[in-house]
């Protein structure tokens, strides 16, 4: 519980994509990104190493790669505009950076939704020392 409180306090000072990403996951996957994916596998949460453990962890790996390709902007803080129509996310910005970051978040949120059956509680708070092997290229 203390960890969730610390995360909540930290998020109060965060604007832009991370908060929007959380809301997008809630709208699409119907679950909290912070709770379910904040510390999952080898790639969900801060950093990443080794090989993704399952399809859910791979969603985070792909998201990390996508953020790494964002050019001329900080994907974790940029704010973007999106809407949800008929359960589908539509990224609405014309700005290339905002559009790219929104698309990264959209793809990950849909990936989480589509891979809920692969979620394995054994990978929640998975120790980094268990994340072995050469990382795959993005």
From Swiss-Prot:
Gene3D superfamilies registered for this protein in UniProt: Phospholipase A2 domain
Organismal lineage: Eukaryota, Metazoa, Chordata, Craniata, Vertebrata
Domain of life assignment: Eukaryota
Origin species: Crotalus viridis viridis
Cofactor note: Binds 1 Ca(2+) ion.
Molecular-function annotations in GO: calcium ion binding; calcium-dependent phospholipase A2 activity; phospholipid binding; toxin activity
Keyword set, alphabetical order: Calcium, Disulfide bond, Hemostasis impairing toxin, Hydrolase, Lipid degradation, Lipid metabolism, Metal-binding, Platelet aggregation inhibiting toxin, Secreted, Signal, Toxin
Active site location: 63, 105
Alphabetical list of PANTHER family matching this protein: PHOSPHOLIPASE A2 FAMILY MEMBER, PHOSPHOLIPASE A2, MEMBRANE ASSOCIATED
Cofactor(s) essential for the protein: Ca(2+)
Enzyme nomenclature, EC number: 3.1.1.4
Sequence positions that bind Ca(2+): 43, 45, 47, 64
InterPro entries given in the database record: PLipase_A2 (IPR001211), PLipase_A2_Asp_AS (IPR033112), PLipase_A2_dom (IPR016090), PLipase_A2_dom_sf (IPR036444), PLipase_A2_His_AS (IPR033113)
Predominant cellular place of this UniProt entry's protein: secreted
Designated name of the protein: Acidic phospholipase A2 Cvv-E6g
Subcellular location: Secreted
Pfam families xref list: Phospholip_A2_1
GO biological process, alphabetically ordered: arachidonate secretion; lipid catabolic process; negative regulation of T cell proliferation; phospholipid metabolic process
Keyword Heme tagged: no
Functional note: Snake venom phospholipase A2 (PLA2) that shows very low inhibition of ADP-induced platelet aggregation in platelet-rich plasma of human, rabbit and guinea pig. In vivo, shows efficient edema-inducing activities in rat paws. PLA2 catalyzes the calcium-dependent hydrolysis of the 2-acyl groups in 3-sn-phosphoglycerides.
Tissue: Expressed by the venom gland.
UniProt family annotation: Belongs to the phospholipase A2 family. Group II subfamily. D49 sub-subfamily.
